[in-house]
């Protein structure tokens, strides 16, 4: 184990032999760190935190700090981070609250760029990228392979669907459906994330089905409540379309609209 002499470790901390920890890092509490993980200088990890294998945590990151919530009373909550996660400089990930499931979750193969923030009770899926200074409010859910651009902010309790792309400097207050592109101060939809879907190997037939579903739901004159049912009837054989319909029907905050609405 390569641990700098200035590192402070307190509590029930599990650190495998091949983990590396840089200077002036502080690890306190019930912390479990997976094999092959590398932790930089001046990192803070505290509370109930589980970090997976082969993660890279850069200088100044803070993981497991108390949530920024006025009703938090010091209860035992946690942070769970998956495998192969990259956490760049000065990222902050806060632990959960009793108002939700009590834990903040970051999946596998996630990249959190410098100064991005994952608030209490968030659930970030696998293969997500958050660019510099992107911010998630409390209780936000981000689906697998979503991309959130730099300096964007997602309102508490909002959702970003899988394979969606949120442009830089975007304010997200309503749910962003899977496979879509959103942008703007008050996020609007700009169609399907075709480039991203092709890069990830989606068949053209599936992409066309998703595009048709988008047109029916967001660009046709059909009533917004009726359109998803029609899409399900016409294109329900496609799993991706079913996911889009289910996401929209389950929305509690409402769904972002097409930019020309």
Swiss-Prot record:
Main subcellular location of this protein, as a coarse class: cytoplasm
EC number: 2.3.1.129
Pathway terms, separated by semicolons: Glycolipid biosynthesis; lipid IV(A) biosynthesis; lipid IV(A) from (3R)-3-hydroxytetradecanoyl-[acyl-carrier-protein] and UDP-N-acetyl-alpha-D-glucosamine: step 1/6
Any one Gene Ontology molecular-function term assigned to this protein's record: acyl-[acyl-carrier-protein]-UDP-N-acetylglucosamine O-acyltransferase activity
Pfam families: Acetyltransf_11, Hexapep
InterPro entries the record matches: Acetyltransf_C (IPR029098), Acetyltransf_C_sf (IPR037157), Hexapep (IPR001451), Hexapep_transf_CS (IPR018357), Lipid_A_LpxA (IPR010137), Trimer_LpxA-like_sf (IPR011004)
Localization per record: Cytoplasm
Gene Ontology biological process terms in this record: lipid A biosynthetic process
Family stated for the protein in its record: Belongs to the transferase hexapeptide repeat family. LpxA subfamily.
Name the UniProt record assigns to this protein: Acyl-[acyl-carrier-protein]--UDP-N-acetylglucosamine O-acyltransferase
The species this protein was found in: Aquifex aeolicus (strain VF5)
